[in-house]
Amino acid sequence: MEAELFHAGARAAEWLRPLIRRAGGPLRCENVVVLGEVPGVRHRDLFAWPHWALKNLYGPVGIMVGKFHEGEEETARGGEPVPAAPVSFLPVRAAVRRRDPAFLHATPGLAVALASAEDDGRDVFAHVPHDWQELRAWTKRLRRPERPSTGSETTWASRSWPGS
């Protein structure tokens, strides 16, 4: 399921890249939605690896990838409650270079890359392996933010990844 989620996110990002440069482009967004349950896997865990890989691949070309989990309540930076998502989804959209880096405070290198991003048409997969398992291994080597995982004593950086 992770492979399909990653593939759908990459397709959404590639679909958006040429559209963002057109009129109204910065307002475009594609949502990759997961409906139903995956036996034995929480959506939070299912989204973790594909989300991290997509952020690192597409942030440097100005694409922001987020993640929201069904029913999860969050608080905005200003302290206001954010309505719970009705479904789990990955929003894939044009980055707002002045504001989005603030969402990446736990990964300063990625924040800098997003703030200065310019889509020059590069192949974001040119420098990464194309084999699925090798791509997962490449992603695991990227610096992950050190923050507690919800409901767990481990950090997100040290957690075990499904299928690894």
What are these regions (language model features)?
Residues 1-164:
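Expand to "…catalyze enediolate/carbanion chemistry for C-C bond making/breaking, isomerization
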